[in-house]
Design a protein with these regions (language model features):
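Conserved, structured core segments of small domains
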Residues: 1-83
């Protein structure tokens, strides 16, 4: 199952000077394959596309950012929408 994750933090909690955006997720979370990361840095928002079978695995992936971010997890279709 694919998930689109929108992770947002405030400017005051920005990780830029504290290890960067890589400190906001666990790349070794069991059961999660990270497919893409995109940033809207002026908005303090990071977007992830991950593949996982269980939501608990996605939550473990996001655990490092729980104290400084909010996250919206949305299941998405594996089939692209093309006109």
């Amino acid at each position: 199952m694919l998930f689109h994750i929108t992770q947002t933090h405030s400017p005051e909690l920005c990780p830029k000077d504290d290890g960067g955006s890589k400190t906001l997720y666990n790349p070794k979370a069991e059961g999660v394959k990270l497919l893409a990361i995109y940033g809207a840095f002026p908005e303090h928002v990071i977007y992830y596309i991950v593949e996982a079978e269980k939501i608990e695995a996605v939550e473990a992936f996001l655990m490092p950012g729980f104290k400084r971010c909010t996250s919206k997890i949305t299941p998405v279709s594996k089939s692209p929408i093309v006109n």
